[in-house]
Structures are given as structure tokens and as C-alpha cells.
């Protein structure tokens, strides 16, 4: 968002046409949604938060754009450019620790290449450098919070309970 703002300014967009404001939802986000002079809200994130925004903004007839609860699949066919697909699939699964709405959270693979893909994907993921998020060599850093870590771990536990295998 910050870079988008810089690009728009460099392109000559007048000040005040696009405003990018960073902050936490309960303080900054709530103030933006409730402000009577803000006529449009765009939000990408969780469904629960989106519903809260809609409840507040809709009676004020604000324009709303809500992109909620993404479950983006990677769909992989046998005739793809295999190396390019593998690189993109690893990146799309683990960019920003998998915590952004654009990350692939599911992978559908054509049966004829499933075994090869599974082995190659796991091998590439194991090569990712886990470490300090401030180190330039780190490819996988920390999750955003302890509650988020607990949520991720609960999904892993659930997968195991349902017969899944951690690769």
C-alpha cells in the first residue's frame, strides 16, 4: 500500500485523493470506518472483521469493497512449465509466512504429476531459510502473534486428527 501511494504521488495524483493510513484495526481502522467524511472503505482480511465493518458502514451508505477470508487454490496441470510452477507455488504458499490474502492455501495437482510435485515441493520448502525476520537472508520469519501461531498449530493438530500427514 505504501508503494502504491508513492507511485500515485509520482504519477501526479493530487494530495488527498488517495490516502493510505497504517495502524491497528481497533484504533485507526474503527475511526476510519466511523468517520462521516470518509465515503468509501476498502478492506482485505478476515470475515469477522469485514462483517463488523459492513455493519458500521452500511447504514452510512458508504461504498464498500470487502475481500474476505481468502482460500486461494493453486491449480497445477501436467502440461505446465514445471520449474516455473514449482517456484511460484512455493512463493505463493509461503510469502510473508503465508499470512497474506494472496497466498495459496490449497494446492490441486493433476494426478499424473502428483507424486513428483509432492516430492519436489517438499524439497523446495525444506530449503527455505527460517530465521530472524529482520535478517536479509531469512525467507520465513515469525508469525504475526502468539494467538495466530496457536491458530496455525490447531489446524496442524486437526489435520493429524483427521488422518493427514505432515510432510
What spans do the regions from the language model cover?
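PLP-dependent aminotransferase-like
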Residues: 1-29
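Amphipathic, non-transmembrane alpha-helical secondary structure
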Residues: 2, 30, 34, 83-91
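Short, solvent-exposed polar/charged micro-motifs at secondary-structure junctions
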Residues: 28-32, 141-144
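ALDH superfamily catalytic-core signature
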Residues: 40, 46-167
Amino acid at each position: 500500500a505504501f508503494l502504491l501511494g508513492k507511485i500515485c504521488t509520482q504519477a501526479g495524483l493530487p494530495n488527498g485523493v488517495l490516502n493510505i493510513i497504517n495502524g491497528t484495526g481497533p484504533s485507526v481502522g474503527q475511526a476510519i470506518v466511523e468517520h462521516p467524511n470518509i465515503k468509501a472503505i476498502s478492506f482485505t482480511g478476515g470475515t469477522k472483521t469485514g462483517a463488523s465493518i459492513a455493519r458500521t458502514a452500511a447504514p452510512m451508505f458508504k461504498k464498500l469493497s470487502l475481500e474476505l477470508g481468502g482460500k486461494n487454490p493453486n491449480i497445477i496441470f501436467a502440461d505446465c512449465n514445471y520449474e516455473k510452477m514449482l517456484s511460484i507455488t512455493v512463493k505463493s504458499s509461503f510469502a510473508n509466512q503465508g499470512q497474506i490474502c494472496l497466498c495459496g492455501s490449497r494446492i490441486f495437482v493433476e494426478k499424473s504429476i502428483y507424486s513428483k510435485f509432492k516430492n519436489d515441493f517438499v524439497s523446495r520448502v525444506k530449503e527455505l531459510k527460517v530465521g530472524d525476520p529482520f535478517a536479509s537472508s531469512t525467507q520465513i520469519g515469525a508469525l504475526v502473534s502468539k494467538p495466530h501461531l496457536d491458530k496455525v498449530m490447531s489446524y496442524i493438530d486437526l489435520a493429524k486428527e483427521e488422518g493427514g500427514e505432515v510432510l
